């Protein structure tokens, strides 16, 4: 829908909805059958949870901290949120006994541009291609995120 009013540069990173649960909990989409998941209200993660078949219940929370607290308190079986939010939360809570699980969906994140601004779009795409090719993007990605966050496909 947005593509009708704006243009997008090539994706500069990939993220998406990721499951987090206790290590012996539902860490895959198929394992969520019959389970209750916590999500932040009015997000793509809440939308994705609604599309999952077989969930017992979806509990929505004001924010991810509340959803994570519900998981820690075992009020939900799993939490679905942004991959990097899950990673940062688990890094800050290493003794929680909670692990990152399977991705529910992938989001390819791109810069939004004014419609028909081909010059800017081409320059951004060229610059991104150059730093991808010479390894700069991967090096910075690994330095700050501990992994390559580029969209490889």
Stretches found by the model and what they are:
Residues 1, 22-23, 42-44, 63-64, ...:
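Beta->alpha turn/N-cap motifs
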Residues 1-31, 102-103:
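Acidic, polar ligand-binding/catalytic clefts
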Residues 24-25, 44, 59-69, 73, ...:
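Short helix-initiation/N-cap motifs at beta->coil->alpha
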Residues 29-43:
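Short loop->beta-strand "edge-of-pocket" segments that line small-molecule binding or catalytic clefts
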Residues 31-33, 82, 116-130, 136-140:
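Short amphipathic alpha-helical coupling segments at ligand-binding clamshell hinges
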Residues 44-61, 97-103, 128-153:
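Ligand-binding clefts/hinges and TM-proximal coupling segments of bilobed small-molecule sensing domains
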């Amino acid at each position: 829908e947005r593509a009708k009013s704006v243009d997008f540069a090539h994706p500069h990173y990939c993220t998406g909805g990721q499951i987090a649960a206790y290590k012996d909990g539902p860490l895959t989409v198929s394992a969520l059958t019959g389970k209750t998941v916590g999500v932040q209200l009015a997000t793509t993660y809440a939308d994705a949870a609604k599309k999952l078949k077989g969930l017992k219940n979806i509990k929505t929370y004001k924010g991810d901290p509340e959803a994570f607290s519900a998981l820690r308190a075992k009020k939900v079986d799993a939490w679905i949120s942004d991959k990097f939010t899950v990673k940062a939360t688990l890094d800050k809570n290493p003794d929680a006994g909670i692990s990152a699980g399977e991705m529910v969906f992938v989001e390819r994140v791109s810069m939004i541009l004014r419609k028909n601004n081909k010059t800017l779009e081409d320059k951004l795409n060229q610059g991104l291609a150059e730093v991808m090719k010479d390894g700069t993007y991967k090096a910075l990605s690994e330095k700050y995120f501990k992994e390559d966050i580029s969209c490889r496909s």
